[in-house]
Amino acid sequence: MSIKYVATSKLPTPWGVFAMHGFEDTETSKEHVALTFGTLSSDAPVLGRIHSECLTGDALFSLRCDCGFQLQTAMQNIAETGSGFILYLRQEGRGIGLLNKIRAYELQDKGANTVEANEQLGFPADMRKYDMIQPMLEQIGVKHVRLMTNNPRKVKAMKEIGIEVVERVPLQVGKNRYNEAYLKTKSTELGHMMSEYHFTDEE
């Protein structure tokens, strides 16, 4: 994998003005983005998140997942902290792509869970890779992280490239009647670390 830094621009948001850094994978032509806020330290832990693209949740306000809620909460937390980063990776549908994700949703509408749907389409439960994060973090100057995630694979990916994960910060937001079963499957079958709050009926 060959990641090339392209350019940086300002990104005004409801939570403040972030910097948006563009990257291109010259082997796959996929484009990734790093958002940064404030002054990042290479010596002190920086609050951050690795976020995989989710068009339905991030842009179309879908309640089938917690992705959009997690992205907005991460940006808000970073702004309130005064500094931080988000690596926005173009890995739609845990790596299977948008159209296959819609096919998976169709199977879920018929009773399959999120893992079963991927497998019925011939895909692993999670196809995402994280080798692109090393050059992205080098570009923005981050070496120590307070990582906002429920996914142990992301913590492992950070450690494997030599980034110290000082703290895992849980990001449990967005539970609703449309995604409760999905969240439970992420915990029981994909190993995501979530509290019982996500598996009890809303009052």
UniProtKB/Swiss-Prot annotation:
So, what pathway does this thing act in?
Cofactor biosynthesis; riboflavin biosynthesis; 5-amino-6-(D-ribitylamino)uracil from GTP: step 1/4
Gene3D superfamilies associated with the record? GTP cyclohydrolase II
| Listed GO MF terms | GTP binding; GTP cyclohydrolase II activity; zinc ion binding
Give the matching InterPro entries: GTP_cyclohydro_II (IPR032677), RibA (IPR000926), RibA-like_sf (IPR036144)
Detail which positions bind GTP. 49-53, 70, 92-94, 114, 149, 154
Per the similarity annotation, which family is this? Answer: Belongs to the GTP cyclohydrolase II family.
Catalysed reaction per UniProt?
GTP + 4 H2O = 2,5-diamino-6-hydroxy-4-(5-phosphoribosylamino)-pyrimidine + formate + 2 phosphate + 3 H(+)
Cofactor (UniProt): Zn(2+)
- GO CC entries: cytosol
What's the domain of life for this entry?
Answer: Bacteria
**Protein name from the UniProt record:** GTP cyclohydrolase-2
User: Which amino acids does the record list as binding Zn(2+)?
Assistant: 54, 65, 67
* Active site positions: 126 (proton acceptor), 128 (nucleophile)
**Pfam family of the protein (one):** GTP_cyclohydro2
Organism ancestry = Bacteria, Pseudomonadati, Pseudomonadota, Gammaproteobacteria, Alteromonadales
Per the entry, the cofactor note is: Binds 1 zinc ion per subunit.
Keywords carried by this UniProt record = GTP-binding, Hydrolase, Metal-binding, Nucleotide-binding, Riboflavin biosynthesis, Zinc
- The reply on keyword GTP-binding is yes
